[in-house]
Design a protein with these regions (language model features):
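Short secondary-structure junctions and interdomain/linker hinges
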Residues: 6, 10, 69-72, 110-114, ...
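Charged interaction/catalytic cores of defense and host-pathogen modules
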Residues: 1-101
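Residue-level signal for well-ordered alpha-helical segments
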Residues: 38-46, 50-53, 125-129, 133, ...
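Generic structural concept
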Residues: 59, 100, 104-107, 170-177
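Helix-loop junctions and short alpha-helical segments
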Residues: 63-148
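Generic preference for hydrophobic/aromatic residues in regular secondary structure cores
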Residues: 9-15, 32-40, 116, 121-122, ...
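Amphipathic, oligomerization/interface secondary-structure segments
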Residues: 131-181
Length: 181
């Protein structure tokens, strides 16, 4: 909620002005955008539906918000009736970095260990001692091999991945290793 108050979602979702009511952002219909992106209903507004979120809903909403957060840089102060800042310039990368930092601090305390990746995907956090396996450099400069290893690793760690998804990720890694052999 604090990021919303600080204007981090103003560029995408708009903001409230005492003179003009709701000023639209880049996303005109947030509920529709969530439906098209996540393919689920009854997620927006968050304040209305959050109490009924499943774990997957919660993590999907985090990924959705990551795509739309941006740090407010410059704007004009609308002082009439305490309206506040009307942000006009934003930095998406800085906003995403701060969002990721704050979300990962929350996810650190969640019952199942997850982390928000630099790509905006919520992934299972590796168990203690296994971090090096997931962070190791791929022993190849071939972008196709690196891409396949990264995709398999992400598919294995992805929130909501089924046992079959994980099996397929292991098979994909085995195929790469066989090729490298």
């Amino acid at each position: 909620r604090q990021l919303e108050i600080d204007g981090y979602f103003s560029e995408a979702f708009g903001f409230w002005c005492v003179d003009a009511d709701h000023i639209e952002g880049n996303v005109k219909d947030i509920e529709l955008e969530m439906l098209l992106t996540i393919r689920k209903k009854n997620l927006w507004p968050i304040s209305e539906y959050a109490s009924s979120y499943t774990e997957d809903d919660f993590l999907d909403v985090i990924e959705f918000l990551y795509q739309y957060v941006s740090k407010p840089i410059d704007g004009t102060m609308h002082s009439y009736n305490g309206c506040g800042m009307h942000w006009e310039t934003f930095n998406k990368k800085d906003g995403q970095n701060l969002f990721r930092e704050k979300i990962n601090a929350v996810l650190e305390h969640y019952k199942n260990k997850f982390e928000l990746s630099q790509n905006g995907e919520v992934l299972h956090k590796p168990e203690e001692g296994f971090e090096q396996i997931f962070n190791a450099d791929v022993p190849s400069k071939d972008s196709n091999i690196v891409g396949r290893v990264d995709a398999a690793t992400t598919n294995f760690r992805r929130h909501g991945s089924s046992l079959d998804d994980r099996r397929q990720a292991v098979r994909d890694l085995a195929d790469v290793l066989e090729y490298l052999r």
